[in-house]
């Protein structure tokens, strides 16, 4: 019975793959924020979620004021929170107020935790075609100016400017309409382009919500924001970023979080996760940039693969002798073979070669992919080992065996005869912004704490090692080819 319960629990975690684990229940999540090693997000109604590792989430974040759809941004050594007090039909109409407040920390247990008095920065009267709700923040990295986009389907998406030192409305600033037919907007900047993200479709209808996230871009923060075919978002344009998936629907309230150069994630909610009673949950997915446009990447889920280096296209493998497969010699000159019926040749099996392998640790290397047992890897999530933003850690073993890839104390990679669950045998796998992946050991023997610097690295065409991550070299990048 105990084994059955364990199996069912594992299946439940696997089935809820669209959501983070723990209690990730939230609606209208703010952009993720990091404070003293923990991650925070705030939602409609006050409060929010906290995570120690970015994978398992629980309630406990504290935000006064109630209201809806907050956003949060670290500016200097303080955190600015912005939220809608009413509007969006919450009070029976569309008269709304957007307010800002500051805190030195997001940790409600800290002695420094205290929100400043909330200050109104804009409002809607319920009569005009505008709704002061759903604010999103952007601190322009090129100018230092602080912008807010806000609004709903009730009217336009508007842009205003705040003073980044006070969080107050910039004196003399006049609002500008920049989009329609969306809500829960957000702004981001990349490579000379400003991007306006908007949530399109129907909200708050559970498994029937059609929410999806669209985007346009502009060379100016004030627009116009055009999509991939030139449609202005002020006239209903928008390129799809993420929509419903097989077991979840209602993607809304985009937020961008940069982990490292070339490592970005988007936070949002699913209006309904079908595996979690159709509840609204936090989701975190990689951002992949394709031809200058953001799209939702895929959280790695494990399976059977060969692991290919981006540097050369060679495969990661065990350093063992190559065992030849038996086949009658071919050629135009072998008339006897040419007259035989055609039949398939079976792949080489593990049983045919495993006894030729050493019994202890076997170093890893990189070589031509030949679909041989020493090149076939099984990658399995280890949910009980914790995780990082978007995923749990994984173990990487030779398919059909317990032989596991591991980091060594001298920053090399080897395989140990049997997986033990040690931190150096756990791997962080993240999709990069170009669609490739980085692979990082959770820990390196002899180094303190969780490893956040060193990744699997092609030191040469045939030599894997561990080296500091650098997005600007293909030596750090890998691809997983499904078997």
Which residue stretches match the model-derived regions?
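Hydrophobic h-region of N-terminal signal peptides that target proteins for export
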Residues: 9-18
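Beta-rich carbohydrate-recognition and catalytic domains
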Residues: 20-133, 139-182, 189-242, 261-304, ...
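Signature of short aromatic-glycine-proline-rich micro-motifs recurring in repeat-based ectodomains
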Residues: 244-258
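Lectin-like carbohydrate-binding module/patch detector with strong preference for beta-trefoil
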Residues: 302-483
């Amino acid at each position: 019975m105990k084994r059955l319960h364990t199996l069912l629990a594992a299946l439940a975690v696997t089935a809820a793959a669209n959501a983070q684990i723990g209690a990730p229940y939230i609606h209208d999540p703010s952009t993720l924020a990091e404070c003293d090693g923990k991650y925070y997000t705030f939602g409609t109604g006050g409060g929010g979620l906290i995570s120690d590792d970015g994978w398992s989430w629980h309630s406990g974040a504290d935000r006064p004021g109630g209201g809806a759809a907050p956003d949060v941004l670290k500016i200097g050594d303080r955190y600015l929170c912005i939220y809608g007090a009413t509007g969006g039909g919450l009070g029976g109409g569309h008269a709304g107020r957007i307010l800002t407040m500051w805190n030195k920390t997001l940790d409600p247990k800290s002695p420094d935790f205290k929100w400043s008095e909330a200050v109104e920065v804009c409002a809607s009267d319920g009569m005009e075609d505008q709704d002061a709700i759903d604010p999103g923040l952007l601190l322009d990295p090129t100018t230092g100016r602080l912008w807010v986009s806000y609004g709903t389907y009730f009217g336009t998406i508007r842009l205003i400017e705040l003073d980044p030192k006070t969080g107050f409305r910039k004196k003399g600033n006049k609002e500008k309409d920049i989009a329609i037919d969306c809500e829960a907007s957000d702004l981001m900047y990349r490579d000379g382009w400003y991007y306006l993200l908007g949530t399109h479709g129907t909200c708050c209808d559970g498994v029937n919500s059609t929410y999806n996230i669209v985007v346009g871009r502009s060379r100016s923060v004030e627009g116009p924001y055009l999509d991939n075919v030139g449609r202005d978002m002020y006239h209903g344009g928008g390129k799809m970023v993420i929509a419903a998936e097989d077991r979840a629907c209602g993607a809304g309230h985009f937020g961008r979080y940069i982990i490292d150069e070339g490592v970005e994630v988007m936070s949002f909610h699913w209006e309904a996760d079908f595996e979690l009673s159709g509840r609204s949950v936090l989701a975190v997915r990689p951002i992949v940039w394709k031809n200058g446009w953001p799209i939702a990447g895929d959280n790695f889920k494990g399976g059977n693969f060969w692991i290919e280096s981006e540097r050369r296209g060679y495969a990661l493998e065990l350093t063992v002798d190559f065992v030849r497969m038996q086949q009658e010699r071919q050629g135009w000159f072998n008339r006897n073979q040419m007259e035989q019926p055609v039949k398939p040749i079976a792949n080489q099996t593990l049983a045919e070669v495993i006894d030729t392998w050493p019994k202890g640790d076997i170093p890893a290397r990189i070589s031509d992919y030949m679909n041989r047992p020493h090149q076939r890897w099984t990658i399995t999530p280890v949910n009980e080992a914790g995780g990082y933003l978007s995923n749990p850690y994984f173990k990487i073993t030779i398919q059909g065996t317990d032989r596991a890839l591991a980091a060594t104390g001298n920053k090399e990679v080897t395989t140990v005869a049997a997986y033990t669950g040690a931190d150096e045998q756990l791997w962080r796998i993240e999709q990069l912004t170009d669609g490739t992946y980085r692979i990082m050991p959770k820990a390196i023997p002899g180094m303190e704490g969780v490893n956040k610097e060193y990744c699997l690295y092609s030191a040469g065409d045939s030599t894997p090692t561990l080296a500091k991550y650098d997005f600007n070299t293909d030596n750090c990048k890998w691809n997983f080819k499904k078997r």
